[in-house]
Amino acid sequence: MKNYNQVYVRNSLEAAAMYCDAFGAEITREFRNADNTVYEHCELSVNGEGFLALAEAANPCDISFVHKHKWETMTFNVFEMGSEEAVAHAFHVLSRGGVVLEPIHALPWSSCCATIIYRFGVCWWISI
């Protein structure tokens, strides 16, 4: 049995590209709408392992509200990223247009981590 998360966002094509950039992921399956403008379903993998699925949100939340109030309803944890450089790269990509809740710092359980609500409203905790 395997398990990974799926996010529903507006601008799903752009979001998938950001995830690929931030985490070194690749699109392994994709199903677009008839107009070829959004993902009905898209699966991403990192090093051959399923990482995340995404689809276009039919009823998106108000991202400006999420950012203004730093609203965390759920956080996606990406850990064992391998290096501080990998964490810094993901932080740079995800923080563009987003809200940094915790900049890159150390905690007792992680020597290099950060928390960001990125521009599509999803909260990410990234860690070495």
Report residues per predicted region:
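Vicinal oxygen chelate
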Residues: 1-10, 17-117, 126-128
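Active-site His/Glu-centered metal-binding helix of metallohydrolases
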Residues: 120
